[in-house]
């Protein structure tokens, strides 16, 4: 039995996906993809599923996601799901399809929040006092 493990990251959210042979079920934190709320999040998570089409009919994917907020978790989950589908099927045309549609389906976003600097630490990383000329 073939099993594939992949990881997707976005800011502080980390999604770990496990793909194995099955009947096309996708579960996120043990909850079916169809029951995800709000609708915007569900639609974004359906993108790799719609693009994959029939390639997903014999794959079960279980995703555990932790950390971050709801949108970061969604992005991390999309990346983990896209990577799992491509790695499990091994089809280059599917990989090209994902990359041409949206690169973040296969590549994690490396950006992180900038650390606050000393002195005006509570105000943010680049806060300066406003200068007055009069």
Swiss-Prot record:
| GO BP terms, alphabetized | maturation of SSU-rRNA from tricistronic rRNA transcript (SSU-rRNA, 5.8S rRNA, LSU-rRNA); translation
Please give the superkingdom of this protein's source.
Archaea
Phosphoprotein in keyword set: no
Residue ranges annotated as compositionally biased, kind Basic residues, are: 118-134
Any one cellular-component term (Gene Ontology): cytosolic small ribosomal subunit
Keyword terms, alphabetized: Ribonucleoprotein, Ribosomal protein
Q: Which HAMAP family match?
A: Ribosomal_uS9_A (MF_00532_A)
Matches recorded under PANTHER family: RIBOSOMAL PROTEIN S16, RIBOSOMAL PROTEIN S9
The UniProt family comment states: Belongs to the universal ribosomal protein uS9 family.
List the NCBIfam families.
PRK00474.1 (NF001749), uS9_arch (TIGR03627)
The protein's name in its UniProt record: Small ribosomal subunit protein uS9
Organism expressing this protein natively:
Methanococcus maripaludis (strain C7 / ATCC BAA-1331)
What's the encoding gene here? rps9
């Amino acid at each position: 039995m073939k099993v594939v493990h992949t990881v997707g990251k976005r800011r502080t959210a980390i999604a770990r996906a496990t793909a194995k042979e099955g009947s096309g079920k996708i579960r996120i934190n043990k909850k079916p993809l169809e029951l995800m709320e709000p609708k915007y999040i569900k639609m974004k998570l359906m993108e790799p599923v719609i693009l994959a089409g029939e390639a997903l009919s014999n794959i079960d994917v279980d995703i555990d996601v932790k950390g971050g907020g709801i949108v970061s978790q969604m992005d991390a989950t999309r990346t983990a799901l896209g990577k799992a589908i491509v790695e499990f099927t091994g089809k280059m045309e599917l990989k090209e399809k994902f990359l041409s549609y949206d690169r973040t389906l296969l590549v994690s976003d490396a950006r992180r929040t900038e650390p606050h600097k000393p002195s005006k630490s509570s105000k943010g990383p680049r806060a300066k006092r406003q200068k007055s000329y009069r």
